Each structure stands twice: as C-alpha cells, then as structure tokens.
C-alpha cells in the first residue's frame, strides 16, 4: 500500500518592510502553505502576494490565524473568551478567503499559529470556538491540527475533514504534545535524524518521545519550517528522503 504525505510550512509571515523567511524558495519544496492572516504576522499585501505565489507554484493554501500579538509573534499565551476566539477566527479566515476568491484558489485548510495552536489542543472551550469560527467562514475547509489532540477528535466528531499534523523538527512528549521550546529536546536539528523520525511516523504510525518511549501517532501532513538559512536544505532533504522511500508527497487537492 502506498503512503501519502503532505508537506506544509508557515509562510507569509513578513510584515511591511520587515522580511521573515524565504517563502518563494520554500514553495518549491512543500505542497501546502499556512498563510499568516495579519495578527501575529503578515499584512494585506503579503497575504495577497503569498496566495498568488501559491497558485503559481501549485501549492495548496491554508489560513494560519494567530492571537493579536505582533510583538510576541503570537507565541505568548492570552486569556481570551470563546466569543473572542470565534471572532478572531472569522476575522482572519474571512480576510484570507477574500484573497483566495480573488485568485480563484481553494482554501484547503486552517492551521492555528503558536500559542493559539497549543492552547486549542488542550482547552475544549477554546477548541470548540475555533471550530465554530472555521465552520462559519468555510464549512468545506479542513482543520490541520496536532495529531491526536482534543481539537482533532472534536473536529472529527463534527464531521470536519481533519489533517493530523506532525512535525519534522520538533520533539514529542509521552502525551503526544510538542516539547516546549524552552526545554531540552524541543528541536530536532540533524536532517538525517529528522528524516528517520518522519519515516517512522508516516510508514509505521509511531514516534519516539523525549523520554525514549514510543507512542502511536497519525501523520497526514508534516510541518517543516522555512525561517532560517539552513531551512531550504533541510526541507529538500526531507522531501527527497520521503520520495526515495516510496512515499507519495502531495497535498489533499491532488489525491
């Protein structure tokens, strides 16, 4: 049986005169893009340019909404009510949906950013509000969420198409969550080690945690980051390794 996998990356995170990442190069190697929607990063011109580039390169577009936290790049926890979270979703997804409509591009999915992503994995009322917002804007869009998390299970219960996401360059805890960025084992920097972990997740449905324990995991899409000079070589190494192993790399619009 052939294994399929999507490769996604967070893009469109520049702002005004400030450039972050190497989006044009990253888009040559990934199959799905998570486009920042202006609150943790990005702005209207960046959003439009990113959607246009995705269409030109045949990369699927997803919304990447975050908390309203430019200074903290959306990585700081915020205490928001369910009503606020739902409104945040509608506001940001609605903006990106407009650019998708302009260029006749399907909004394939939604993936939360930073603290919004992590908190929605373990906070039921926040996850519920996020999914309410997604369904309000685009009921057909998929939810790209941390594999095995609460929000993944709730989305499935609602009948929302789910993309179970795993990470090429992050460590996992025994609970299936990501090792916090401030702790040892949070990042996988060696490309070969990362590739071996990705192949185990994709082909065997397992991952080794930071304690050495092996846990089950479902991998529909692998996140690769493109915000540093070594990132392009890292992404290329992962994609070539997957292809050599017989894994078909494609987004969800080309299966």
Predicted regions and their residues:
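Conserved, mostly hydrophobic/aromatic
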Residues: 10, 64, 110, 224
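Active-site-adjacent beta->alpha loops and helix N-cap segments on the catalytic face
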Residues: 16-22, 41-53, 121-128, 147-157
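Glycine-rich tight-turn/loop motif centered on a GG-T
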Residues: 19, 23, 33-40, 71-86, ...
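Acidic (Asp/Glu)-rich catalytic clusters
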Residues: 24-28, 49-62, 101-104
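Glycine/small-residue-rich loop that forms an oxyanion/phosphate-binding "nest" at active or ligand-binding sites
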Residues: 69-109
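Flexible, glycine/charged-enriched surface loops at secondary-structure junctions
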Residues: 100-108, 205-216, 248-255
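C-terminal domain-boundary segment and adjacent tail
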Residues: 141, 233-255
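Active-site rim beta-loop-alpha module in soluble metabolic enzymes
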Residues: 148-206
């Amino acid at each position: 049986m052939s294994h399929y996998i999507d490769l996604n990356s967070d893009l469109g995170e520049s702002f005004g005169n400030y450039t972050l990442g190497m989006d044009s190069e990253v888009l040559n190697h990934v199959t799905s893009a998570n486009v920042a929607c202006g609150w943790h990063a990005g702005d209207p011109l960046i959003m439009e340019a990113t959607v246009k580039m995705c269409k030109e390169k045949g990369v699927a577009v997803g919304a990447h909404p975050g908390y309203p936290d430019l200074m903290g790049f959306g990585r700081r926890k915020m205490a928001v009510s369910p009503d606020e979270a739902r409104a945040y979703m509608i506001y940001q997804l609605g903006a990106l949906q407009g650019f998708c409509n302009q260029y006749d591009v399907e909004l394939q999915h939604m993936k939360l950013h930073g603290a919004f992503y992590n908190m929605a994995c373990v906070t039921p009322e926040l996850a519920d509000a996020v999914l309410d917002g997604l369904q309000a804007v685009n009921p057909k869009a998929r939810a790209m969420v941390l594999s095995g998390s609460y929000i993944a299970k709730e989305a499935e219960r609602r009948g929302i198409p789910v993309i179970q996401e795993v990470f090429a360059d992050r460590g996992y805890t025994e609970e299936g969550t990501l090792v916090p960025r401030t702790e040892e084992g949070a990042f996988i920097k060696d490309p070969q080690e990362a590739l071996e972990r990705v192949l185990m997740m994709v082909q065997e449905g397992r991952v080794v945690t930071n304690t050495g324990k092996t846990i089950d995991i479902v991998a529909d899409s692998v996140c690769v980051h493109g915000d540093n000079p070594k990132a392009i070589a890292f992404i290329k190494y992962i994609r070539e390794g997957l292809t050599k192993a017989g894994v078909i790399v494609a987004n969800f619009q080309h299966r």
